[in-house]
Amino acid sequence: MSSGHAEVVGGGIGGLTAATALALRGWTVRLHERDTRIRTVGAGIYVWDNGLEALDTIGAAAEGLDDAYEAPAITVRASDGRPLYRIDVNQPGGARCVTLLRDRLIGALHVAAEHAGVEVCTGSAAVSATADGTVEFSTGTSTRADLVVAADGVHSLLRDRLGISYRRIRMRQGAARVMVSGERPFIPGMDVDQHHEFLGGRRRLLYTPCTATQTYLAFVADNDDTATVGPELDLAAWARAFPLLVPVFDAARGRALIRWDNFELIRLSTWSHGRVAVLGDAAHAQPPYVGQGGGTAMNSAVGLAAAVSESADVEDGLNRWEQALRPPIEKAQTTSYRMRLIGSVPEVLRGPLLGALGRSRSSATSQLIKKRSAA
């Protein structure tokens, strides 16, 4: 169908992108966010070509990428700083990757949604949806739509009550996050304006410039690592594991700690049931090792809007959408899930393994771009 009415549940990256993409194709769209305002955790995010193309498609690129950061490379290093693997980005003819503040991205998506005519309803908690397009709310009210998009996150109520079977892996690893403002902390012998990932035993430190003055740090560890899980980071323990990074830990001292999150992987038996589509982390959550969580959500959202608008009916469009987007997104998931293994192999093997996984990452990203362009 060319257009109709859609109810979108979830005011995150996937939900806002889907709502805007549908509205731009002539749909009337109402978006529901259970919180009292559209907001997000204030950390950094990587956006690759597929996400950048989606932002451009919905008119959110200019505002979203204002003050975003483009580094020339991402280098994976041993705990002593030795390079193990390097990915060149933002070079002529190569992959593009920008980093930015997550709240800047959400803000731009929110503005784009309102400009497109989306009705944004905050404090509106959907509790279930059925195959005929009926959405029920915590107030006891309900509404019906031609299309329902369940983009309510990894703990999705709508997905769980829709009856779709799925596999959910709660991983041992997770991350605590810190934003550092001001002059970048000095790392001996390294370009602090590049992205770096340091590996030391079961721990990783991701160092990500996000703007000219703000740097995002992700402290990745197992969920039983007492130096990382809890109300405060034990930065002395991290300094013992990564002595080269003492200036980074000094810069992080006293900064607000963004909540610990365990990494998860979710795969559904199907991405839709009747007139209900499941999108983003609710459908294909993945650990952040290849930086594609947000990109795949935006990529999938724009593809969804195109498929249902260009098909004879909604259910046919949802089938076409899944057939086109699921294979490359699951390839990105698989690559990201395999990246967890780096922490459990001897250091001498990490370089060759990272090379193999890096080639898989490049292949997965390339497929996402091709599929998005063909949608």
Curated annotation (Swiss-Prot):
Keywords recorded for this protein, A-Z: Monooxygenase, NAD, Oxidoreductase
Catalytic activity as recorded in UniProt: 2-heptyl-4(1H)-quinolone + NADH + O2 + H(+) = 2-heptyl-3-hydroxy-4(1H)-quinolone + NAD(+) + H2O
EC number: 1.14.13.182
Signal peptide from the UniProt entry: none
Cystine pairs: none
Superkingdom of origin: Bacteria
Induction (free text): Up-regulated by PQS.
GO MF annotation terms: 2-heptyl-3-hydroxy-4(1H)-quinolone synthase activity; FAD binding
Principal EC category: oxidoreductase
Acetylation found in the keyword field: no
Family recorded in the similarity comment: Belongs to the 3-hydroxybenzoate 6-hydroxylase family.
Family annotation (PANTHER family): MONOOXYGENASE, PUTATIVE (AFU_ORTHOLOGUE AFUA_6G14510)-RELATED
Function, in words: Involved in the degradation pathway of the Pseudomonas aeruginosa quorum sensing signal molecule HHQ (2-heptyl-4(1H)-quinolone) to anthranilate. Catalyzes the hydroxylation of HHQ to PQS (2-heptyl-3-hydroxy-4(1H)-quinolone).
Protein name in the entry: 2-heptyl-3-hydroxy-4(1H)-quinolone synthase
Organism the protein comes from: Mycobacteroides abscessus (strain ATCC 19977 / DSM 44196 / CCUG 20993 / CIP 104536 / JCM 13569 / NCTC 13031 / TMC 1543 / L948)
